[in-house]
Each structure stands twice: as C-alpha cells, then as structure tokens.
C-alpha cells in the first residue's frame, strides 16, 4: 500500500481487494502489474478464493482455474508451501493461466489441462481444499457483458447444470476426509446453485454445508427452492449487484466428514538427484535450502517440484513445478519464473529500480 501509485478504496468484504476508477487510471499498463504486485479482477469474483480457508502447506486444487485470478490468490495463501494444482480443460486458456501464475511468482504448482474425470485418476482423496468456479449460464454478468445474454440463449441453466453436477461429484472424490470444497458460479438460477449442491449431498451425504464468513451485503441461499427445504442452504451465499458493488455470484462451502471412506492416491517416491555444478554455483548466491530430491531435469530444463505428489505418468501438464532455468554451455541461465519467485532478500545481487525509471 505504501508504494501504490493509484487512488484506491477498499472492497469491504475482501481483506486484500480494492476498487479503482478505470476511467482515470490504467493499472494494467503500470510496471507494478508486470512485476506481479496485483491482479485485476471483478470484485465479486474475488470472493470464492478469499472465502476458501487455505492454509500454508495445504494441497489445493482449482478445477476450472483459467485465467488465474482465483488461482493466484490461492497460491499466495499457500506461501510457497504445499501444492497448488491449477487446471483448465482448455489448453489455450491454461497457457494464459500459466503465464499469470508465473508472473505472480507462484512456484509450488502444477498447471494442467485435463477433464476433471481424468484428474480423479491421479488425485483420488488427495486434496485438503478444492475450489470449483464452475462454468455456468452467466446470469450474474448480464449487466456487465451483454454478450452473456446471447450465450445464455444458446446454452441455458439446463445445459450447465448437467456439467456442474459432473464436475462437483468428480471433485468430491478428490477431496480427502475432513477437507473443504468451495463451489461458486456467476449466475442466479437455483438449478445451477442450490440445485447442484442438493444433488451433491444426495450422492455424497458425507458432505455438510458450512458457514461462510459473512458481510452485510451478502444474501443467504434459498432453502425454499430445494426439494429438501433444508435450512442449511441459508448458509450458502448469493451476491446481488443491487445490494453490493460487484456482479452476481453464488458460493457454497462444503466439508467432507472426517469419517468418510474413500480411496487415496499414494505419494510417489522422489529420489535425490545430483545437483549440476552450474546450478550449484548459481545457487550459492540464493538463500534457499535447495533439496536435491525436488529437482527434475528434462534435457536442458531444470524444474523444482512440489513435494509429496502422486504418480502422474500420462497426465497433461503445461508446467510441473517451478522452472528454475536452463543448463546451457556449462552455465545455468535462470528463468523469468525463478526471478518472479525469488524475494529480493533471497538473492545476493539485486538492482532496485523505481517505477518511473527509463530502463523499465
């Protein structure tokens, strides 16, 4: 905040979110944006990642992660501990997701492009926390984006509810006992919101709806639109644009019982690698405890992998771990991803430039 060059005001229900006037300033053109100091996102869309209680060291899955606004927040919460699996079924969208995560210095990550059903093969009962920002009919975005109205006419709530039910049940099987899952949409239709959650609870009664940290503008979910009329649906949250300064959204936080019985993917063994001399020489200037068993070398490229991963042979990756750099002609060439991941105090040789320096 001390170095912020813009006039901003806090978003009252997001502890690290702020409004800005897009007619007066262009934050996406400022050097701080390219340095990964902030991400530009619609205010209501910040809420799902903010309300999923991720802790450092968690294993976290973002099922439908592109373009990366929620994934960057989840990665920041992990503080380079644990693992973030950021997935998007579209490989082209996943490339943008990877770019955003690397700009923000997220290193303990896997960026994948798989259908949730295939993810389940690798990550059964594996994750502590899962975020599902589900594809939806987009009714909550009609005010902001008129193209969403035409898209709704082509594929409405009935189409998306089938897709959502498939995604949420597959995700449920990837959550470990005691884990938490947050489901969100940017639509108003009960079929896609309370209806999807009711379907999950019918298929997997070991899940319970949890309270979401409140805000005076949040509206409760609607038990009356469900078959069960279960009052717990009032613990889910609806965000309406006429109540808050943000677009329409729905959120439901769920917990899997500690006693739930489900298969669990075993952790694969990570064998220690010999650290190449060129890499070892470079890291003499880096204040890291470089762990040899986390190194993964493919040709010239050197990756630093998260720990305690399952066997992932055959999975579709865009990135596995942090790309440290490349071994070229008996020297190590560090990557931009590594530069974004390192804190200034972690490297011996730095140059501190002001945002208005001509070299930027």
Q: Predicted segments — roles?
A:
Residues 2-46:
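Conserved AdoMet
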Residues 57-66:
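Conserved class I S-adenosyl-L-methionine
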Residues 92, 128-169, 186-193, 207, ...:
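Mobile active-site "lid"/loop adjacent to the S-adenosyl-L-methionine
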Residues 1-5, 247-250, 257-360:
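Polybasic, low-complexity RNA-engagement segments
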């Amino acid at each position: 905040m001390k170095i912020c060059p813009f006039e901003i005001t806090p978003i009252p229900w997001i502890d690290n979110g702020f409004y800005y006037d897009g007619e007066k300033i262009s934050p996406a053109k400022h050097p701080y944006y390219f340095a990964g100091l902030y991400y530009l996102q619609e205010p209501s869309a910040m809420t799902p990642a903010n309300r999923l209680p991720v802790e450092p060291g968690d294993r976290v899955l973002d099922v439908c992660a592109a373009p990366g606004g929620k994934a960057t927040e989840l990665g920041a919460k992990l503080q380079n501990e644990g693992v973030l699996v950021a997935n998007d079924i579209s490989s082209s969208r996943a490339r943008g997701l990877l770019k955003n995560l690397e700009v923000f210095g997220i290193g303990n990550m896997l960026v994948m492009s798989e259908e949730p059903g295939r993810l389940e093969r690798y990550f059964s009962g594996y994750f502590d926390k899962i975020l599902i920002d589900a594809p939806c009919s987009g009714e909550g975005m009609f005010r902001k984006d008129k193209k969403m109205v035409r898209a709704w006419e082509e594929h409405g709530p009935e189409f998306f509810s089938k897709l959502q039910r498939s995604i949420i049940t597959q995700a449920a099987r990837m959550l470990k006992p005691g884990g938490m899952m947050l489901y969100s949409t940017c639509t108003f239709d009960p079929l896609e919101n309370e209806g999807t959650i009711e379907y999950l609870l019918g298929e997997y009664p070991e899940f319970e709806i949890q309270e979401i940290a409140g805000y005076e503008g949040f509206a409760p979910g609607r038990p009356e639109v469900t078959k069960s009329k279960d009052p717990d649906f009032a613990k889910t949250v609806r965000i309406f644009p006429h109540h808050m300064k943000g677009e329409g959204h729905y959120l439901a936080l769920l917990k899997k019982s500690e006693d739930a019985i489900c298969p669990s993917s075993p952790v694969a063994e990570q064998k220690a690698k010999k650290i190449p001399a060129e890499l070892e020489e470079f890291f003499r200037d880096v204040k890291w405890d470089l762990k040899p068993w986390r190194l993964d070398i493919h040709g010239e490229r050197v990756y630093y992998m998260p720990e305690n991963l399952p066997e992932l042979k055959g999975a579709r990756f865009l990135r596995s771990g942090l790309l440290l750099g490349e071994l070229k002609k008996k020297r190590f060439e560090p990557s931009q991803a590594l530069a974004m991941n390192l804190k200034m105090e972690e490297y011996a040789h730095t140059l501190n430039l002001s945002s208005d320096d001509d070299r930027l």
